[in-house]
Amino acid sequence: MKVALMGFPLSGRTTLFDALSGGHARDGIASIPIPDPRFEALARQAGAKKITPAAFEWRDDLPDFNPDKPETARQPLSLARQSDALVCVLRAFDSPYAPYHAPIDPARDLRFWLDEYVLSDLQVIENRLERLTKLFQSHKESAADRAEHALLSRMHAALSAGESLAAFEIPSDLEARLRGFGFLTRKPMVVVANIGESLLGGEARSEMLASLQAVCTAHRLPMMSLCATFERDLRQLPESEQAEFLQMMGVAEPALPRLVRLVYEQLNLQAFYTIGDDSRAWLLRRGGTALDAAATIHSDLARGFIRAEVCHADEVLTAGGWKAAQKAGKVQLVGKDYLMRDGEVIYVRFNV
């Protein structure tokens, strides 16, 4: 799962990326494991020789652009389409050492981004509608082409009215045709207010953040505040010193795990596991089936799917391992349409 960090120059976007990656990433891309104590316990219990946690690929490789020249946003927005989720980093601190391009106003900056997403999606749809119209003129269109044109026309009307495409239901027979467009206004998004250290400790409150929260509420966007420089400095300390630093700054806990949880929730994800010498955690959209889980592991497992054995991680841990859970009758044999639950261990029976 790819998560793109969006933000103006000097918003703190790269500082946040450095905090997430520990400053060890190259080229603005970092695969960062998702904390999962349940999986860690399963891997220990199984005596795994190789342990692979689920991870998000965080990206801070989008080109900067000049906020005074919106046309320069075209390339970064085009690259953002390739991501699964967006994290919009907004500057909510002032500093003479990092002069900003305008007075500090995160609500204004968020509205700018939201408008750019709408305009960018409009351009994508207009280009596609133009190609479909030419196809119609040659009388070579299919029924699917006509259905796509009708749906895109409705989407165009919504975007022209300033609405996002988040609420649009795309028929299953058109999903594959539209997936490559990567509509920005349909992507899960988390808003991050990058505050100064003076607002650390307790719940950050200011008139500026209240205005930002109002915009987020109107657009049904989750918002959190953090201080990217503080998170980066905390991450660079030895673990033995981090608790003391948090206490000294009056901060209950690091903010980064909360950011990861928010992105996880916005992507509507759940985890499942394969355990043994090679133990792995996998990500699956909620509502995914046993067949979807098999396909996530390897296409051959889905192609030759016969049945799957599943058992919740808690029951495996309580029983003392997979074989013990089998003996205790906790393991279920399920078909391809079985709806996976968060935290299940799976073994796929297949034949190719």
Regions found by a protein language model. Give the residues of each.
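Conserved G1/Walker A P-loop phosphate-binding module
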Residues: M1-A102, A107, I125, L132
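C-terminal-of-GTPase-core extension/linker across diverse P-loop GTPases
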Residues: M1-F17, S21-G22, R131-V352
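Conserved phosphate-donor/acceptor-positioning beta-strand/loop module used by diverse small-molecule
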Residues: L86-F93, E116, V191-G196, S225
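Short, conserved loop/turn and helix-capping segments at secondary-structure boundaries
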Residues: I104-A107, L119, S206-A210
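Short, charge/polar-rich alpha-helical segments
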Residues: R111-D121
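Charged face of amphipathic alpha-helices used as oligomerization/assembly stalks or helix-helix interfaces
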Residues: I125-E126, S153
